[in-house]
């Protein structure tokens, strides 16, 4: 089960700070850098605000109790939110499915796609494990 609220900003203080950091990094650096540059800047911004940030966190994928592969999430914040960063012209469905698969493979239910493209944009994805 997935739900999509592209422009709905959760009232959560955590999410508010993450999105403010995203826009601060975008507005400071502007458009045109590689994804890694934005990832490093966002990491430093979130660490400075006191968040626990894991970068390129390995997510194992299992099939019938056998490990069949792994993904690497761009960032995991406070063990509760996955951030997937992009530098695309626009977010596409395959970006959304990538994030949904990360959520499926973990106990984390909330993820954000953050696009540092020509125009900053984000999408929130929620995957319920129940």
Residue ranges of predicted features:
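Single conserved hydrophobic/aromatic residue that forms the stacking wall/gate
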Residues: 1-9
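Nuclease catalytic cores
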Residues: 12-16, 31-35, 39, 43
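A short, surface-exposed helix-loop junction/capping segment
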Residues: 18-28
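Conserved catalytic cores of phosphodiester-cleaving nucleases, focusing on short active-site segments
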Residues: 30, 53, 73-91, 102
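A short acidic/basic microdomain associated with nuclease active sites
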Residues: 49-65
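Nucleic-acid nuclease catalytic cores
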Residues: 86-130
């Amino acid at each position: 089960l997935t739900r999509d609220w592209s422009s709905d900003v959760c009232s959560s203080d955590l999410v508010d700070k993450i999105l403010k950091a995203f826009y601060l990094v975008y507005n400071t650096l502007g458009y045109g850098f590689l994804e890694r540059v934005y990832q490093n800047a966002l990491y430093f911004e979130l660490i400075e605000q006191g968040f626990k940030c894991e970068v390129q966190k390995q997510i194992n994928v299992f099939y019938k109790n056998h490990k069949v592969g792994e993904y690497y999430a761009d960032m995991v914040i406070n063990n509760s939110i996955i951030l997937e960063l992009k530098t695309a012209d626009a977010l596409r469905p395959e970006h959304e499915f990538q994030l949904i698969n990360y959520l499926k493979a973990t106990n984390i239910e909330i993820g954000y796609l953050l696009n540092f493209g020509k125009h900053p944009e984000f999408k929130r994805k929620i995957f319920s494990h129940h």
